[in-house]
Structures are given as structure tokens and as C-alpha cells.
Amino acid sequence: MLDDEQVKAIWCARGGYGTVRIIDLLDFRKFAANPKWVIGYSDITVLHAHLNGRGVETLHAQMPLDIDKKTPETAKSLKELLFGNTYTIRYTDISHMLLFT
């Protein structure tokens, strides 16, 4: 799938521990010429970091396994992003979210 030009996104179904074991075995040369969205979190973070280090944007986002347990906005925002729509997130004060030790 990494090299398939017709594949536009790879949405990882669930986490696990396999990515860290195979990341050094993957050849990303063709992928770099035809990048695609890689979507997921957990174990997939290794793949995100690897691709981000090569200048490829990825989506650290909900996996399909649990998306039905989230709000409808979760699926909607992911779909909009994948189809090129953008939106702005506005906030007024995040000081209550900051933790200093």
C-alpha cells in the first residue's frame, strides 16, 4: 500500500506493537514520490514520527475500530480534512490547560 499510487490514504485499524518492529524494514523511496495520508494513533506513532521526519504530513487521529464510540463530529471532521476542507478552531484562553512544575 505504501507504493500503490491509487491508494490515497492508509487508515490503521488499530494499534499494537508491530510498527516499531518493522519500521526499519520499510522502503519509503516510492512513498516519498507519491505520499498519502497515514491515519491512526498508538503504535502508529512510530510511523507518524518516521514520516514527519521526512517532511510528510500525517494524521494522528481516531482509528476506525473505535470511531463509533466517539461523537459524530469526530468522523465528520476527519472526513472533511481528508477531502480537502479546512476549518478554524478558536479559543479564548488556554491558561487553565497549562501545567507548570
What are these language model-derived features?
Residues 26-51, 57-64:
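Short, acidic/small-residue loops that bind anionic groups at enzyme active sites
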Residues 24, 49, 76, 80:
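Charged/polar, solvent-exposed surface patches and flexible loops
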Residues 18-21, 45-50, 66-70:
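Short, well-ordered, mixed-charge alpha-helical segments that flank or form enzyme active sites
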Residues 56-101:
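Conserved anion/nucleotide-ligand pocket segment
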